[in-house]
Amino acid sequence: MLIATLLSASPFSSHVYAGTDHGLFNSVATELNNDVSQQKTKKISGTVVDETGLPVIGANVVQKGTTNGIITDIDGRFSLDIPEDAVLEISYIGYLTQSIPVGNKSSFQITLREDTQKLDEVVVVGFGTQKKVNLTGAVSAVSGEQLSGLPATNIANMLQGKLPGVSITAETGQPGREGTSIRIRGVGTMNNSDPMILVDGLESSMNDVNPNDIENISVLKDAAAASIYGTRAANGVILITTKRGKVGKPILTYNGYVGWQKAVRKPHHLSSAQYAELYNEGRINEGAAPAYTAEDIEKYRNGSDPDNYPNTKWMDLLLQGSGFTHNHNISLNGGTEDTRYAVSLAYYNQDGLIKNASHERYNVRVNLDSKVTKWLTFGINSSLSRREIIAPTNPFSNDIGQFFRQANRIPNTFVNQYSDGTYGRHIDGNPIAWIEAGGKSTSVYSHAVGSAFAEVKIIDGLTLKGIAGIDYNFDDGKTHIKEITYGDGSVQGPNSVEDYLDRWMTVTLQGILNYQKQIGKHSFKGMLGVSRESYRKNLTKAYRKNFPSNELTELDGGSTNGWSNSGSALDANIGSYFGRINYDYAGKYLLEFNLRSDGSSKFAKGHRWGTFPSFSAGWRISEESFMKNIDWLDNLKIRGSWGKLGNHRTDDYQYIAMIALGQNYNFNNVVADGAVQTKANNSNITWETTKELDLGFDAGFKNNLVNVSFDYYDRYTDNILAVVPVSLLFGLDAPVSNAGAMRNRGIEVSLGHVHKIGNVEYDVNGYMAYNKNKVEKYPNPDKGDKIKMEGYAWDSFYGYECTGIFMSDEEAKNSPVHSAYVKAGDLKFKDQNNDGKIDAEDRVVLGNTIPNITYGFNLNMKYRDFDFLASFQGVADVYRTVDTEMMWGFVNGQNATERHLDRTIVENGRVTQLGHFPRILINQSHNRVMSSFLAMNASYLRLKNLQIGYNLPQSLLKSIHLNRARLYVSGQNLFTFTKFPNDFDPEVKSGSGGYSYPQVAIYSIGLDITF
């Protein structure tokens, strides 16, 4: 990903020409120079394959230092007359050249290894491809091969730590609902900051893409690279390209793994006896009598009466799922010069860490390319996917987080199951009883994508391409909540069923005209396009409760008392015109201009259209004549860009008045149907606009032994849609206006090193990115626990600076405090303005909720038939909070963890033991205000992936008729280095620690086979 290099020309490639007839591979004439013709020669033969065992078609096989050579045929075979003392040189674009002495051998089996520097050269950009060495915008890329075999639960998790400037956070480990957040160069707006994602040119979701189908992923980060997508590109663009057929005989491959999951981190709760002792301590601290006697505590400790004095390990009881996962992929790839195909089937299954939780996915993909005539090419991209996500339900909702909340907050002093088999209960219920009852939520997502293109060659260099595509999604769901009966006779309910059906469809039509021309050292490329997209969404819901039996799951079985039905529909359309011009002089001076004009139905007439230009330029200094004698410098390019982008990702119909139905009224003693406007509209709203400057350079040293890339950017987003406060006398909810502004500035640095020492090949690469966010304009300031104000980073923590713990009642009495209840053992806060009191004016910014620094580094090694991969990912300068009950413990009698053993102990108004936590309190809450004690440093470094593989030797594979077989073991989320409390994952969303399904580590064994 981080390595960029120039393709070096083969010493023989300029003498070999291959047509469309495969027979030409065998009929290419060899040129024998005079020296060769004078020597004694012999015939040799062999096969050239890649590291997967597949034949390399068209590889150059030449006698070194001569033009005596040939190219391999469709099966990778060659035959050549050559002197015995000659050296055979084998080369092919994208692979490392090999030199082999002929000696007395007559048969050769040659394996070419990939040159990662060269394979990285061409990257996918908007509506086309570009040589990386000629890029003038900021683009990061990763190949599908770099993701192959990783046991991650989704594609976004696979990308963590691999793309500079891209921050990816997985908020939970729940199967199918990981809650992954992707941010490119920070948060660009107060509204939707998600990037635009396209799969094979159509806007779509990456959740339904089979990772093994991916050829490459490109991330367009700056305005120059992304502006060709205009309306939705303000937060960056992710382009996913799937694999296409290649010329050659059919190649059948299988890739699969089986794995097991476990929680990365989970809370360690106090035993019942410990809880009772510390609970008593908290009661005494508040001046109340102890709740547990010494006899009670001893019974909890010895376990003699488990029905009345239990020690229930709620989290262990909850995490009883198998955690088993397996993934299987079969693909067929091949074709002729006229027709190529790529077909794949995939199945993925993930069982949860808790019972009745799972994620199952099926994928089918067919990509086809056909050269109908010399001037007409036709192709299709089609895929079908089906995902079924199952989760247990509880009496409150279908939120799986409620199970973890209960398992974390119910003290071990409450019984789970009595000796007679009935269930005990806490005031909120029993999460184990909920699971065993068998209520569940099922969501079945069906996703069909189909597109077809036809490309006409009009004249040399001029083509016209038409594309038609449809993206159809169908989400069919049911939530079944069961009534629970407990051992004490109490009932928790009611039982209920909710059905929903959500359908949405996008139709895309595009026409693209491409032209390229080379005139001497001048190279020109131009593109003009038009696009139309229409989107429609329909949602239907129905709900009933109080079923006569828990086993009834159809709506008709429920009561009509309290039933509800609802439905909604949405239509949206986008029209676009776009173009691009590229100019390249002698590979040294590079220019690019993009322009896109978009019209969106989300805005009123007169405000729908926006125009988004961008400019970029590059200078390859290393190609100048005055640089030719600097042999340690292979490549040096400086580049810069400026562009304007748009964002219309906001709620629909905001320019239209909102009318609420069902507002009935009495008219002449008769209740009449009524409707009323509830929210003011603003017909003047328009695009959020982003202007971005990017300056950078790319350099390669010592035959690309070391590669460096650097970017500085300044991104300013204006006209952000925000609610402007209105007087209460206005009478309606305030409308949105283009009233906000935000700036992101940052740098990105990437380093790469590739080398070979003997039989050891290795590739080390890494990056570091820094982003600083600042709100420039915001009409509705909020100074709560998370600040939303001009001059500060968006959503930063805002509270008191904690300076320690009061050591005595006297110290607390003589110090500025924020509560009359503050005593020895409580938190001490800084009086920022020195006015002798602690109040809201003493609050300060405590830290960012979004990391300012992201980084990652990767190591790939090969030794003979062994390979090794390690991938690390980290963030810094970021802060998180956890759930209040989990943070403090004992809140209103809730549970506590072993961390709370390290508390401050107070006797007779003085601290006798200073701990990390202040003194334990049960009901008093003055320590729980937002402060630097609560907003904790969540920086971390995580070993995301570790993989060791072994390729079976070719001698063995021949006997079992395989081209390639590779065995590997792999792990994900294996180690985390952080100062964040070890009960919680630092990646989890703030405030949800304790409410969230934990992140998972995955250990897997896999197999790759090529037939």
Q: What is each model feature region?
A:
Residues 1-365, 372-373, 377-385, 449-450, ...:
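Short, small/polar-rich motifs associated with maturation and membrane association
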Residues 48, 112, 203, 454, ...:
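Hydrophobic beta-strand positions in extracellular immunoglobulin-like domains
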Residues 133, 175, 246-311, 322, ...:
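Surface-exposed loop/interface segments of Gram-negative outer-membrane beta-barrel transport/assembly proteins
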Residues 167-171, 227, 622-629, 956-958:
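Active-site phosphate-binding and catalytic loops of NTP-dependent enzymes
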Residues 242, 330-334, 364-370, 450-456, ...:
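Residues on the lipid-exposed face of transmembrane beta-strands in outer-membrane beta-barrel proteins
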Residues 345-351, 591-600, 642:
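Transmembrane beta-strand segments that form the barrel wall of outer-membrane beta-barrel proteins
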Residues 763, 848-876, 928-977, 996-1011:
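Conserved C-terminal beta-signal and adjacent last beta-strands/turns
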